[in-house]
Amino acid sequence: MSARTVVLDDLQQEAAKDLQLLTNKPVLYVCNVDEASVVKGNKYVDAVREAVKNEKAEVLIIGAGIEADIAELETYEEKQLFLEDLGLKEAGVNKLIRTAYHLLNLQTYFTAGPKEVRAWTFRKGMKAPQTAGIIHTD
């Protein structure tokens, strides 16, 4: 039995955090499918979804072959046209990153200066002073 499937009240959740149970960690299941199944999935994706439906886990569908083809394209426009032709809104790698950030309760803050643009990762719900502590480490 996975700790993700157990319903706990707030006090119990706090106590469980101290145990650092591996089965309480967020899980992302990535299903690599063929091109025909990349939009809606297939019976195997459905089986994974059914198996983990009570786990508070995410199931993501990606076509590794499609991702390889996208990586070979030169321009953003070419990549967008390729994705549109397949009925996709974004590349699988982008979905993977976005889903992982969501699952881990993370957000990104961007800073821009004359020499560089940086992305800073912080936990959702952090206050501005805490986030500033990540950005301004000097």
How would you label these PLM feature ranges?
Residues 1-138:
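C-terminal-of-GTPase-core extension/linker across diverse P-loop GTPases
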